[in-house]
Amino acid sequence: VFINASGMIACFNLQGATLWSREVLSVNRTLPFLLGNRFVFTRQVYPPDPNGVFPHKYKDAPVKDWTQLQALDMQTGDVVWTTTCGLNMGNAVVPQKLSDGRQVVVVGRGGGHGPPEKPEGVSLVDLADGSTIWSLPLPGFMSTASYRLYNDKVCLFHKGDHLIVDGITGKILTQTSIVDNIPTSIFAEEKESDQTADLRVGKNKRMITQTSNLLVGKYHYFRSYVRPWLGRVNVETGQVQYLELPLQINARPETEDQYLYFDQSDGAMQLKEQTVTPNSMKNSRGFIVFGDKRSKGSGWGHIASATPTVAGEHLYVPVMNGTVFVIRWNASSLDARAVVDINDLGSAGESYHRASLSFSEGRIFAHTIRELICIKSDEE
């Protein structure tokens, strides 16, 4: 099954013959998945403006125009079910299973650009028929994230808190601050720090970078919205930790690696703008391809990031500027000793990317605006 953002879904056999096609608009960030003989994706009704921006004029659109999950029959392309609770186009939708065997997914509503889906908050959807099991209203919720289950509990971030929600009833069980007096370690110091930080900066409704979160074992990792910091919440104990990281690596042949750190001095550029050199946004043919000035920036702060990926004991955290952090996710303390390596996907300014890393047969696969990349071990 192939899908594009121009309004077409098509299914082909392995010889390339078209089996079926449908004219239907999908969210350009959709993460479709197969469930049995069904193809599940995020369906959208209204398109963005020609400049790629979604205007606020749809904020009061009726339910028929809401963004929804939709399941198609893989054999025919017919609609099997469509949700009614609505979800935000920025959701990273992940199918999961409750302990009673039900296949479910958590979806969220709320965010920037005036999305019409209401109420703001999250819902648990039964993937058997698309029905809503429960909904939890969360006023002011920023839903551009992924939601995972841990022992039948939903783990999510809301404003300055980490919430654990009962996956059976939809009731909030715990609420833990991720911004008030949090232990913070410095990358340059290979030890656990006694420093704490308060991250309540301005009136931000978001406190994590969009779609930067990933639940790995008992740790819920995320990137801060206001600092170049990697954070994690221990969902069993409620412990929160931060590790201050470099903004970007500047690695060049025959020279020692250099790191760019966040400049907080008066008159310094915003976090999202600080780079070794701005991204050129040139593709493999030399054409400049972008519609948002943030694309030239650091990949920290007000952007939608690639979701981290786990392979074995390592968490791979890619940043839009081409830098990739490799973290030992199960480290007892989130400090510099948990950092396995920092590397890049190419030279600074020429390695823009917004995709997660993929893994197969011991190799890492990535792509930037210019290249497809396969990384293998020296032993291979």
Where are these regions (language model features)?
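Noncatalytic, solvent-exposed loop/strand surfaces
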Residues: 1-380
